[in-house]
UniProtKB/Swiss-Prot annotation:
<feature type="binding site">
    <location>
        <begin position="108"/>
        <end position="109"/>
    </location>
    <ligand>
        <name>pyridoxal 5'-phosphate</name>
    </ligand>
</feature>
<feature type="binding site">
    <location>
        <position position="388"/>
    </location>
    <ligand>
        <name>substrate</name>
    </ligand>
</feature>
<dbReference type="InterPro" id="IPR019942">
    <property type="entry name" value="DapL/ALD1"/>
</dbReference>
<feature type="binding site">
    <location>
        <begin position="246"/>
        <end position="248"/>
    </location>
    <ligand>
        <name>pyridoxal 5'-phosphate</name>
    </ligand>
</feature>
<dbReference type="InterPro" id="IPR015421">
    <property type="entry name" value="PyrdxlP-dep_Trfase_major"/>
</dbReference>
<feature type="binding site">
    <location>
        <position position="257"/>
    </location>
    <ligand>
        <name>pyridoxal 5'-phosphate</name>
    </ligand>
</feature>
<feature type="binding site">
    <location>
        <position position="15"/>
    </location>
    <ligand>
        <name>substrate</name>
    </ligand>
</feature>
<feature type="binding site">
    <location>
        <position position="292"/>
    </location>
    <ligand>
        <name>substrate</name>
    </ligand>
</feature>
<dbReference type="InterPro" id="IPR015422">
    <property type="entry name" value="PyrdxlP-dep_Trfase_small"/>
</dbReference>
<comment type="function">
    <text>Involved in the synthesis of meso-diaminopimelate (m-DAP or DL-DAP), required for both lysine and peptidoglycan biosynthesis. Catalyzes the direct conversion of tetrahydrodipicolinate to LL-diaminopimelate.</text>
</comment>
<dbReference type="GO" id="GO:0033362">
    <property type="term" value="P:lysine biosynthetic process via diaminopimelate, diaminopimelate-aminotransferase pathway"/>
</dbReference>
<feature type="binding site">
    <location>
        <position position="132"/>
    </location>
    <ligand>
        <name>pyridoxal 5'-phosphate</name>
    </ligand>
</feature>
<feature type="binding site">
    <location>
        <position position="292"/>
    </location>
    <ligand>
        <name>pyridoxal 5'-phosphate</name>
    </ligand>
</feature>
<feature type="modified residue" description="N6-(pyridoxal phosphate)lysine">
    <location>
        <position position="249"/>
    </location>
</feature>
<comment type="pathway">
    <text>Amino-acid biosynthesis; L-lysine biosynthesis via DAP pathway; LL-2,6-diaminopimelate from (S)-tetrahydrodipicolinate (aminotransferase route): step 1/1.</text>
</comment>
<feature type="binding site">
    <location>
        <position position="187"/>
    </location>
    <ligand>
        <name>pyridoxal 5'-phosphate</name>
    </ligand>
</feature>
<dbReference type="GO" id="GO:0010285">
    <property type="term" value="F:L,L-diaminopimelate aminotransferase activity"/>
</dbReference>
Amino acid sequence: MASINDNYLKLKAGYLFPEIARRVNAFTTANPNAQVIKLGIGDVTEPLPLACRQAMAKAIDDMGDRQTFKGYGPEQGYAWLREKIAQHDFQARGCEVNAEEIFISDGSKCDTGNILDIFGKDNTIAVTDPVYPVYVDTNVMAGHTGDANEKGEYGGLVYLPISAENDFVAAIPSKKVDLIYLCFPNNPTGATATKAYLKQWVDYALAHGSIIFFDAAYEAFITDPTLPHSIYEIEGARDCAIEFRSFSKNAGFTGTRCALTVVPKTLTAKAADGSDVELWKLWNRRQSTKFNGVSYIIQRGAEAVYSPEGQAQVQELIAFYLENARIIREKLAAAGLQVYGGINAPYVWVKTPHGLSSWDFFDKLLHTVNVVGTPGSGFGAAGEGYFRISAFNSRANVEEAMERITSTLKLG
């Protein structure tokens, strides 16, 4: 009889966001007239930038003409998009990243999981707590962990607690770890990292032969000019870091799917025989074998992000969501809640009132004021007692949600 990958049986009952959807669906089925406002999952609501829509429409026309039709594209992405990314997102900030080191994909969520294909199972892996659940769950699926304990922590992972006491930035570990997941601006806490802080991680990784997985999915929301947007703004990072980015949140591509991963050609890791192996070659081989590339139409839309019109329209989108975050942060703070994030990030991290658990606060908001957020405990044991509220919604919905919460619930 065929056997399964038993590692899937180690996973907790359900991925966080499907569990939220299950509870919301049960509530709306029982209360069909309820006007539920969803500020939970970080999905965008505003239309794609006009420049992107126009570029994709033209690309569709290209597909209708034998002279401009495109079949299979390069698995790594079209050179014209990779070059625009290298120029605008990296070289313009002083980062030594060239187009060949950029791999276009259909999502950074996929890439942060798939990157494990090129690493061995004997690596010690460090994640922050709380953390984006995909980092943990994909390692469980890949057989890199033991079972979960009563708090949901998996054996074999090194958890780095982040809290208000350390400004939601993890301390550098005292022992050696091999693979390190960092996300800034942070999901879920909205915390940001300074260059000095990232330099500590780069120095640590270089000293220990570690690799940093740097998730910069929300870098476009940074408005503070002193904060780094890329790990490659830090000297030495090319020799110890892989960076993941996405068009989902800055340009609204959650439904059209386009992202990128940067693997520097100078980056190496050890083979079983002790030799150094270029990770770029392994990732290129992996993508060439398991991935057929992002559609031509979508890549043309992503390319339009870098046009003058696209840049202006993307900045309007970012400013819109950041204003939503400001409204959420200030309204909840004025109502007496402890709030964090929401300044250079689209997420507001909230301390639950009156000692409520994360899921109890979720249920209270859903059933009392018909507002959905994300329980902090879903991001890890250290997230218990916190709650994430997303700025990704319409202005009217954000204002209505804040009015409901602050006027109906006693929060202070």
